[in-house]
Each structure stands twice: as C-alpha cells, then as structure tokens.
C-alpha cells in the first residue's frame, strides 16, 4: 500500500463510519474492486484511532457532562434521576451486546469478510446486507414517530439500540445505520438518534481499536508503515469530524432517504459486478 491509497482509505473510513452507509463494506469493496493490497493490522489500528479521535474531539463537552452527572448520581444514590446520567448508563448497557458479540465472533467474521476467506461470497453477503438494511431504515423512517428527545432516553432504549449495534459487526449493516434505525423505531427524532448513535459508538470503536492494538503490540509497527499509519490516522480523524458535523446538521432538516437510496444502489451495483466477474 502506498501513501495515496492510505489517504483514500482513511477518508473513506472517516466519512462512512459516521454516515449510515457502512464503513466496513466500503473498506472491503475498494481493495477488491481496484486490486489493492490488504491494509494490514497496523493500518486497521490507525483507522480506529482516527475515527475515535474524531468522535472524542466533537463530543468532549457532552462526555464531560455525562461523566459528571453519572458520578453525581452514584454519590446521591439516584443514578437515573438526571437525563445525562441516564444517558451514561444507557451507553454502558448498550455497549454490552457489541462487546460480547465482538469477543466471540470477531475472528470468524474477520476471516470471512476481511482476510479473503469468503472471497466473492463475502462481497455478495455485504451487498445483500447493504440492500436489506437500507429497506429496514426506510421502514423506520416511514413508521417511526420521531418525537422523542435524547433527554427521554431510558435503559431499555439503550439496550435495544445496543443490540442493533451488535449487528454492525457484519459488513454492510453499518454501525451508525443500525443504531439510528433502531432509535427511529423507538420514536426518537433524527438528530437525537444520530447523536446517541455517535456517543454509543465510542466504547465500540475504542474496544475494536484496543483489540487490534494489542495484536499490533505483539508484532510491532514496521518502520516502512509509520508514514501510512500517520496518514490513516489524520485522514480518518479529519473526515470523521466533518462527517459527524455534517450529519447532525443534515438530519435537522432532512430524512435519511439519500443514504437509503445510496445503500440500495451500491448493493445492486456490487451484485452486478460480482455476477459479471465470475
């Protein structure tokens, strides 16, 4: 992989991680389409570090408020009285499903989708998931009431959205897409759904990055990959921050229809490409 490819993949990761169109699907499809080399462990760590930096930089004030309220609730023995404290508990509970699923299934999914084990079949599955979850998001847009605010978030909501987040281990589902979809079904307004999706994603992104980092510590970072590492971190962080800002503002006025159309169109195009490639 060269620096240009690293920058492109970093931009793709940063943009698609926070838009409901599946970052993992794009990171699988791009190297497959253009016959690029496998990014490798070190670069995967760079991408996770970049997107984690983006979401922490954007929501640092929210995180401080949530942390203060959470600890204050524990001290007063009223952990669910304050909405910010409830949000903190919802993030904790909502992070458990993805954590457990990742612990038990990550290696199997990684081998099939990311390490070439699934071949063209993995692309077909990814394409189908892009399409299916696009239709599910359309159903959420159509039937969700969209009146609830983030202050009304409860622990049950956190668990339901967390279960949806666990599905995003499968490329094509989209972590932000699945969590925003679940939140819309629960009646949350679009901006609130996106905001909770991003905050809930912090432990998931950090956990995935930590697992990859532990593996990298064992192997070490080769000197020739250091420039690629920095390029991946920087490009993913900058575009990730911009993607968060864009989507939160976009959803104040518009629906997710453009992303639904994109998901379905991309899935269909990929199915056609695979069919002709065989």
From Swiss-Prot:
GO cellular component, one term: plasma membrane
Residue ranges the record marks as coiled coil: none
Descriptive protein name: Undecaprenyl-diphosphatase
Reactions listed under catalytic activity: di-trans,octa-cis-undecaprenyl diphosphate + H2O = di-trans,octa-cis-undecaprenyl phosphate + phosphate + H(+)
Disulfide bridge map: none
Note: Bacitracin is thought to be involved in the inhibition of peptidoglycan synthesis by sequestering undecaprenyl diphosphate, thereby reducing the pool of lipid carrier available.
Assigned keywords, A-Z: Antibiotic resistance, Cell membrane, Cell shape, Cell wall biogenesis/degradation, Hydrolase, Membrane, Peptidoglycan synthesis, Transmembrane, Transmembrane helix
Native source organism of the sequence: Thermomicrobium roseum (strain ATCC 27502 / DSM 5159 / P-2)
Primary site of residence: membrane
Subcellular location: Cell membrane
Residue intervals passing through the bilayer: 14-34, 40-60, 89-109, 121-141, 153-173, 196-216, 227-247, 257-277
Protein's membrane topology: Multi-pass membrane protein
Matches recorded under Pfam families: BacA
EC top class named in words: hydrolase
EC number: 3.6.1.27
């Amino acid at each position: 992989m060269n620096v240009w490819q690293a920058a492109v993949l970093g931009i793709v990761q940063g943009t698609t991680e926070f838009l409901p169109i599946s970052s993992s699907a794009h990171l699988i499809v791009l190297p497959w389409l253009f016959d690029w080399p496998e990014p490798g462990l070190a670069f995967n760590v760079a991408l996770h570090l970049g997107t984690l930096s983006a979401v922490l930089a954007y929501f640092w004030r929210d995180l401080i408020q949530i942390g203060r309220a959470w600890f204050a609730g524990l001290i007063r023995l009223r952990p669910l009285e304050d909405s910010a404290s409830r949000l903190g508990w919802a993030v904790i509970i909502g992070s458990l499903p993805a954590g457990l699923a990742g612990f038990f299934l990550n290696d199997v999914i990684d081998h099939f989708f990311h390490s070439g084990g699934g071949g063209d079949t993995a692309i077909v599955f990814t394409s189908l998931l892009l399409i299916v979850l696009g239709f599910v998001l359309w159903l959420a847009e159509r039937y969700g009431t969209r009146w609830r605010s983030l202050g009304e978030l409860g622990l049950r909501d956190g668990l339901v959205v967390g279960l949806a987040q666990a599905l995003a281990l499968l490329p094509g589902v989209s972590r932000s897409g699945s969590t925003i979809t679940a939140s819309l079904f629960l009646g949350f307004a679009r901006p609130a759904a996106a905001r909770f999706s991003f905050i809930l994603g912090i432990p998931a992104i950090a956990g995935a990055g930590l697992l990859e980092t532990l593996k990298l510590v064992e192997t070490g970072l080769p000197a020739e990959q250091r420039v690629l590492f920095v390029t991946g971190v920087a490009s993913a962080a900058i575009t990730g921050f911009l993607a968060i800002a864009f989507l939160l503002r976009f959803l104040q006025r518009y629906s997710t229809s453009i992303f639904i159309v994109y998901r379905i169109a991309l899935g269909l195009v990929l199915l056609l490409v695979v069919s002709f490639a065989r």
